[in-house]
Amino acid sequence: MFASVNSVGLFGMETYPVRVEADLSAGLPRFDMVGLPDAAVSESRERVRAAIRNSGLDFPVSRVTVNLAPADIRKEGPIYDLPVLIAILKATGQLKCDTEGCAFLGELSLSGRVRGVHGVLPMVMEAKKSGFREIYIPYENLAEGAVVKGIDVYPVKTVDALLRHLRKEETIAPVSASDYTETTLPPDLPDFADVKGQQEAKRALEVAAAGGHNVMMIGPPGSGKSMLAKRIPSILPDMTFEEALETTKIYSVAGALPKNVSLIKVRPFRAPHHTVSPAGLSGGGTVPRPGEISLAHNGVLFLDELPEFSRTAMEIMRQPIEDGKITIARVAATFSYPCSVMLVCAMNPCPCGFYGHPTRKCTCPPGAPQRYLSRVSGPLLDRLDIHIEVPPVDFDELSTSEKAEPSAAIQARVNRARERQLARLKGTGITCNAKMDAALTREFCTPTPAAATLLKNAFEKLGLSARAYDKILRVARTIADLDGAEQVDVPHVAEAIQYRSLDRKFWLE
């Protein structure tokens, strides 16, 4: 006897339809699985056998062969437990129903309960794309399954409940796809109103948020670098539905989606510790999973104490932060994960932290500050659009009772600047100034003659690279957008050059 049912496979971030085929033949009882299953898939034999028996059904006393097609792609994880069980029951005649337009996925417990799995959102999207009219998913994954419209999504708690539904003895209600609404910022999101002083740093971060620029903050301990960084998500533009969907897919694949959350609507803020491994930062592992840089997609990746990160971890980010994706090459396959992030780095100017402090004396031996700062390579520094000094806050600023400008007011200006960018970049597939390539930079960031002269003098004096030249133009364009100006003029270029001053002050002295 032969039967087959549909499922969906997950390969990195890519999904594909899978046909689960079951064949019963004469011979000594055994249960074989073919189609490049990994260990977790092979182990499903025992889970399926026990789930069938504990659901009051009979496991066939014959030779059972299950094939997962296509057979040239390795199958990973326990997501095929449920479709394998359905295929076997159909092959034995214990389940008689039409499942041709249906897809199944889910892990089984030995008792017959259906457990949640990773990656349900992209797999439901693939099922819709493949033309399936129904998909049966674990009840635990109900929230993310509800995001997709155009396909009936049925949440399943147990094998018994699913079989009763398929036999039309009982009904499982499909989940209702919810409409996307932009969310207001959660009340517990840190606000810039809490930050005393640091007006120059706040202005630089406003420019960075408006244009999606990468930032380096350098200053002594306690000056507020981490405090400022944690408040950046509160001034970034609200996520669009497409951005929320992309981000949620990554969290779904990584198994990091919070319980009962259907969509991630607030921009991620990821702050890995400096002891993170290169694989933890970039992604990978035996079963490849997205790393911190991908989990920060459409949000902020904050690297505090940058020189303390391993050289490999730092250098691994150079290409991804420019390309907006990271590629992990393995012998068996190559995986790509999106990572369009706003990279924010912070560091002390020396090991003790007080090099250049106005009142505290640096206790490092001669040459230590330069050696410490040289841990950050020039090519990585070159990819950071904005460098800002965060000096210590004086007593008068700390003790004032006046409230600082709230994040909502800053976000309003950022939104207006982004709207100008979107209108200017319409049709290019780019959403902010920082993502422009060299050709678009020349087209949209042309300075006035006086501004061009200023930029030329700075280029020669600071010994800037071609990449730094383009970044100054893009930052100047963002400053002009914040001012509502059509042309990039002298004040805009002057402020943008100011944000490259760390090249000269610390790294080149």
Task: Name the predicted role of every residue range.
Residues 170-207, 211, 238-293:
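P-loop NTPase nucleotide-binding/switch module
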Residues 1-216, 220-226, 329, 469, ...:
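Peripheral, non-AAA+ core regions of ATP-driven protein-machinery
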Residues 298, 304-305, 316:
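Walker B catalytic acidic pair
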Residues 217-258, 323:
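Walker A/P-loop
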Residues 111, 303-310, 353:
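Catalytic P-loop NTPase motifs of RecA-like helicase/translocase cores
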Residues 40-45, 60, 67-77, 288, ...:
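Basic, amphipathic alpha-helical bundle interface domains used for macromolecular binding and assembly
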Residues 18-24, 281, 385-388:
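Short beta-strand elements
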